[in-house]
Amino acid sequence: MSDNDEKTVEAQEAGAKPAPKCTDKRKRLGITLVCVVAVLVVAGAGFMVWHEQPNFCNAICHDPMDPYLPTFEATPGEPATDKWGNEVEDAGSMLAAVHNQVGKTCMDCHVPQLDEQMTEGMEWVSGNYDSPLGERTATQLVEARGLENSDEFCMNSSCHPYGRDELEKKTAWMGKINPHTPQHGEQKCTTCHKAHRASVNYCTQCHTDAVVPDSWLSYTDSKL
């Protein structure tokens, strides 16, 4: 074999060697990308699960959420403390505690909306908020979701799947002063039903003989 032939063979062999290296690099890169994507997916899924838990709200927005977590973790039938620091005879009068017992979380009621969360985040960072936060009506609670009917905050397919007519029948046992009979117009659910403090029978503002459910407050007592 001449010198030229030997050089040609060497050149061919030299040119053939990089190909496997390139393939190996691509394989390693592919494996790395798969691992990175897998980690991101798992981390993202874990974050979403944590995001829906009450301790997420408390961990991220430490100060404004501090008064709320105990009302959620309280045990119905036992004394508790409401978000204002008032003693509550029975935590069962606070809907946050009741909802916790059936597996509901903060996000089941307070469905997160990006623009609303951004506004709240800015208020938290700037310190421009009240603590505890002001109480909002059902209308205000569904406003960010674009819902026109505030009843949907409570009466929907995943929570209380019935309308006001059926609701009125469910409380017929309360007699002539049935809080769900619209003799004075339809009231918002949140007028009586409170999540983070003892619920109130608003009817007792005028009807002092109205039935006050166990552990609830009369209108007068709620103002003390």
Show where each model-derived region lies.
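Short sequence/structural segments immediately N-terminal
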Residues: 2-224
